[in-house]
Design a protein with these regions (language model features):
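Residue-level signature of catalytic and energy-coupling elements of molecular machines
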Residues: 6, 24, 81, 96, ...
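Solvent-exposed polar/charged
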Residues: 58, 83, 109, 145, ...
Length: 324
């Protein structure tokens, strides 16, 4: 019997976590030829998410959980879940049912019978999404595909099923500053994309804000590209050429045509323009230096406070001691 692990990052999912498990179980029960296991990762939730995880783990014997000591972010939660997987196939999904488990049969068909290493999803249309957020999302994917070496279709989501080989390859990339969408693409492997229409979450409230999305976009581009650094170098060269041409024109007008140019106007414009370019360049450079600084510390990606994987390990140790 083939096994499938479901990696589910959770942050303040008190309202909908139990409902998510019950709805997902309906799909799992319709696929008796596969053995499913949940790996729920509590990313430092401020509500009762962890207590609900413990309750569910006592009710269903196929539920494992990991609870962080604080909020480390969704990327860390996904990485923690992937590290604890052992199954033939691994699914990464959210707990808000915006990633419908009803797609499992299609995913299984792709990775097991059609020869794909990964079956990923992309957003076809989303009800209730603001136009501003939609425009920002499209701009991000266009910039990312143009500036980085990884290519992602518009609307690409983390929700996907992957082969064991692909998961093991992803785990070899242990950087602290993670951007999983880019990592999924960077490792390669044959991927089938499924487009589906997403809907608003049924229970609870989204924890993603525009500031989080903007930070996520910056992280994605700077994790896989040095194009912003090259951009500042090109801008510097262009400004140098323009300045040189302007100086030559000014000298010709002054020496040969007798035209005098007011100095304060050009000086003020030049100072403001160069000041803006300098600040932008320092900011871009600082972003990359900051990433190097965080990686050089070599801190753990996450810290586990509670986990019932430890109970499993203790049982294995007891069995070994009993069997000699």
């Amino acid at each position: 019997m083939k096994t499938i692990d479901l990696v589910v990052p959770c942050y303040n999912e008190e309202a909908g976590l139990e409902h998510f498990v019950l709805e997902t179980n309906k799909v799992i029960n319709s696929l008796p030829e596969y053995s499913f296991r949940y790996i729920l990762v509590n990313d430092g939730s401020k509500d009762r998410t962890y207590l609900i995880m413990k309750k569910l783990a006592k009710t269903f014997n196929n539920i494992k959980y990991i609870s962080f000591s604080r909020n480390f972010g969704k990327e860390a939660a996904m990485y923690a879940g992937l590290r604890h997987t052992t199954a033939d196939y691994v699914v990464v999904m959210d707990a808000d049912l915006q990633h419908p488990p009803q797609l499992f049969p299609q995913m299984i068909q792709a990775v097991e019978h059609e020869g794909y290493d990964c079956c990923a999803t992309k957003r076809a249309e989303r009800e209730g999404e603001s136009k501003f957020r939609g425009i920002f999302s499209k701009l991000f994917f266009k910039l990312s595909n143009r500036l980085t070496d990884v290519k992602m279709p518009y609307g690409a989501m983390d929700f996907r099923m992957m082969s064991r080989q692909m998961v093991d390859s992803i785990l070899e990339l242990s950087e602290v500053q993670r951007f999983s969408k880019g990592i999924f693409s960077w490792v390669g492997f044959n991927t089938k994309w499924i487009a589906y229409k997403t809907v608003d979450r049924q229970l609870g409230q989204t924890t993603w804000k525009f500031s989080s999305l903007f930070k996520y976009a910056i992280e994605g581009i700077t994790s896989f590209s040095v194009a912003p650094l090259r951009f500042t170098a090109v801008m510097g060269f262009i400004i140098f050429v323009i300045s040189l041409i302007y100086i030559i024109i000014t000298l010709i007008q002054t020496l040969f045509l007798g035209i005098t140019t007011p100095g304060y106007v050009t000086t003020l414009c030049a100072i403001l323009f160069m000041g803006g370019i300098t600040e932008m360049s320092i900011g871009i450079l600082g972003e990359y230096i900051g990433k190097i600084y965080m990686e050089a510390k070599d801190r753990p990606i996450y810290i586990t406070k509670f986990s019932n994987f430890e109970d499993e390990d203790n049982e294995e140790k007891d069995d070994k001691e009993i069997n000699g």
